[in-house]
Amino acid sequence: MRLRFTKMHGLGNDFVMIDAISQRVTITPERARQLADRHFGVGCDQVLVVETPDSPDADFKYRIFNHDGSEVENCGNGARCFAVFVRQRGLTAKSVITVETAVGRMVLHVQEDDQVTVDMGAPILSPADIPLAAPQQATSYTLPTQGAGDITIGAVSMGNPHAVYCVNDCKTAPVETLGPEIEAHPHFPKKVNAGFMQVVSPSEINLRVYERGAGETLACGTGACAAVVAGRLQGLLENTVKVNLPGGSLSITWEGVDSPVMMTGPATTVFHGQVKI
């Protein structure tokens, strides 16, 4: 069969969008890996799938497959693209869209200029729920590494786990070497996304993220949220922060513990196509 898809990106974090409602298709890890392959497939960081929700209270189910075929819990940049995509496909005309994910619900607010604000929910800070091997919850943790010795990180889950490491300069941060080590660190039993954060001012940070299962990407929405939460908990940042990523900037707002993290940024359609599967 020929599978219809749309290629989109959020600040360079690129996606193959699949409508599995109006076309009968099942996306398996193997099929996702084939689609994501930049040499033999369409090519993307993640494959995002729109499905019929299990609950009548949600508009859609949102599934995310990494470049390596692994299915993951959440993707913030993808959520913005998801909201624009379902409207483009005529699956909904709503400007406020509720989606099911593997770890709960997300609410997506589409604005007239295709900027999308995503209610990412409250961050998860308990080590057992991140998950992180630590005796008790703290604003920062010590992580022993081969490449940099003992480093201090913040640890947050935005539905997927993040370690946030403060650096003096993002441009020279050891993302390519330390990123894979943090990602696979035994203190994180489900692996972890590794964020390298440079605080420019209390209202602005620079950020690079080595994503679990994908490597470094041009942007990571959940990583931006996690970095702001970690920075706020350590007293470094204000409630609303401009997050500069290699692919562009996001606005992240977090009022504090138990409040949802709100992420605002663009979603861009690149092209529509078909691929034989």
From Swiss-Prot:
It comes from Saccharophagus degradans (strain 2-40 / ATCC 43961 / DSM 17024). This is Diaminopimelate epimerase. Substrate binds at N13, Q46, N66, G76, N77, N160, N193, E211, R212, G221, T222. The active site is at C75 (proton donor), C220 (proton acceptor). InterPro entries: DAP_epimerase_AS, DAP_epimerase_DapF. It is an enzyme of class 5 (isomerase). Homodimer. GO terms for molecular function: diaminopimelate epimerase activity. The record marks H162, E211 as: Could be important to modulate the pK values of the two catalytic cysteine residues. PANTHER family: DIAMINOPIMELATE EPIMERASE, DIAMINOPIMELATE EPIMERASE, CHLOROPLASTIC. Pfam families: DAP_epimerase. Gene3D superfamilies: Diaminopimelate Epimerase, Chain A, domain 1. It comes from the Bacteria.
